């Protein structure tokens, strides 16, 4: 599927560019597309360099966590749940503990920690893969849940709104939590249907129901706090958790007589191997996305949606927020730029800007996640991963629009 999708980006971009040249006389469109290709190739290297340092750091700390038995302990605690969701992964396998750490880091918005931990988890799952170039069911479930963007503290969205002068930067907090819950639930259900997982199993429910209650209680607590208190808590909790994880790994490692420095260096060496494998996949995906954006195809799609909504007689205010939704699966930086542009054009507290902020906080850069996570282990056949991830993305967008009409219309 990824092969056809990648080719499709170029074909759609070419058709769009030809239409603009032949019908509109815009001969400069081809120069813009070529420029975008080289710009994205440069960006791929820059992203890899940034990932290299982060990966080296966190793979070193994770090696200490493994030697100290932390990852093994997490795997045992969640073993009964993952035996039902990922039956091909043996009980107590290190991948299970790493997956747990990754979800925890994602939920707290700790992207710098989540990505390296996630890549380590994907490599651990790859050790169980009988066909190294084809994604396994466990790898697909892990990737789709990653791409569903479940975040409890969307600090960056608050920051963007504050920079643009919002009266209450955290106004979109609950809408984001509700919308991202939609995307995660749909992602899990879609994979469960395809892989025939039994989510109603008593053991699965024993984990999921208390987790949902804890999440609901946490959301209720945060919703009762003032904007200033919430922003302060977000910053303190994120940084404290990040540093706390590091100290936890080091102290438990020292207590277990692990040679923490030597172990850190040994684990950090793996960062280079992971990073160098990413570059071809990043170049391929980002260049295709860049061409699609530069061709104007996304703008054509937006105009078509606007006309369709008007023809149906529906409210069209949300359409002005769709640029963020349309580019988010392809590029986080482009979606961020679209969000800020929407805020500046319509006003930071306007309905389109509120929808765009909620979309930005409740969706993920699906194709980037796909390229990074599968690229790190050489997966070429993604099977149903793309379809399920995009379905979760769509659920997040529709959920964001619906929740914003509920809260703000």
Where are these regions (language model features)?
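Short glycine/serine/threonine-biased micro-segments
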Residues: 11, 58, 67, 107, ...
């Amino acid at each position: 599927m990824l092969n056809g999708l990648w080719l499709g980006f170029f074909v759609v971009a070419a058709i769009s560019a030809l239409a603009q040249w032949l019908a509109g006389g815009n001969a400069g469109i081809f120069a813009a597309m070529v420029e975008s290709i080289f710009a994205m190739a440069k960006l791929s290297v820059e992203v890899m360099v940034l990932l290299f340092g982060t990966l080296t750091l966190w793979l070193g700390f994770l090696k200490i966590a493994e030697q100290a038995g932390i990852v093994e302990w997490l795997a045992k605690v969640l073993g009964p749940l993952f035996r039902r969701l990922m039956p091909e992964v043996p009980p107590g396998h290190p991948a299970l503990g790493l997956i747990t750490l990754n979800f925890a880091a994602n939920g707290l918005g700790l992207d710098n920690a989540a990505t390296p931990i996630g890549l380590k988890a994907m490599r651990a799952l790859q050790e169980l893969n009988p066909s190294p170039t084809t994604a396994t069911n466990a790898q697909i479930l892990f990737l789709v849940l990653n791409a569903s963007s479940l975040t409890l503290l969307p600090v960056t969205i608050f920051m963007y709104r504050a920079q643009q002068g919002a009266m209450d930067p955290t106004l979109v907090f609950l809408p984001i939590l509700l919308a991202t819950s939609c995307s995660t639930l749909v992602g899990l259900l879609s994979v469960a249907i395809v892989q025939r997982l039994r989510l109603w199993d008593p053991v699965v429910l024993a984990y999921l129901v208390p987790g949902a209650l804890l999440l609901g209680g946490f959301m209720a607590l945060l919703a009762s706090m003032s904007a200033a208190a919430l922003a302060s808590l977000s910053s303190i909790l994120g940084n404290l958790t990040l540093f706390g994880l590091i100290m936890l790994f080091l102290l438990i490692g020292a207590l277990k007589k692990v040679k923490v420095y030597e172990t850190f260096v040994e684990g950090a060496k793996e960062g280079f191997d992971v990073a160098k494998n990413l570059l071809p996949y990043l170049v391929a995906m980002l260049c295709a996305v860049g061409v699609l954006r530069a061709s104007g195809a996304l703008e054509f799609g937006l105009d078509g949606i606007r006309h369709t909504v008007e023809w149906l007689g529906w409210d069209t205010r949300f359409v002005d927020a769709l640029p963020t939704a349309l580019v988010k699966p392809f590029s986080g930086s482009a979606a961020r730029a679209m969000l800020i542009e929407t805020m500046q054009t319509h006003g930071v507290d306007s309905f389109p800007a509120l929808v765009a902020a909620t979309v930005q906080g409740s969706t993920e850069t699906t194709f980037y996640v796909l390229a990074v996570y599968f690229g790190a282990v050489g997966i070429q056949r993604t099977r149903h991963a793309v379809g399920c991830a995009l379905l979760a993305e769509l659920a997040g967008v529709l959920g964001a629009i619906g929740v914003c009409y509920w809260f703000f219309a």
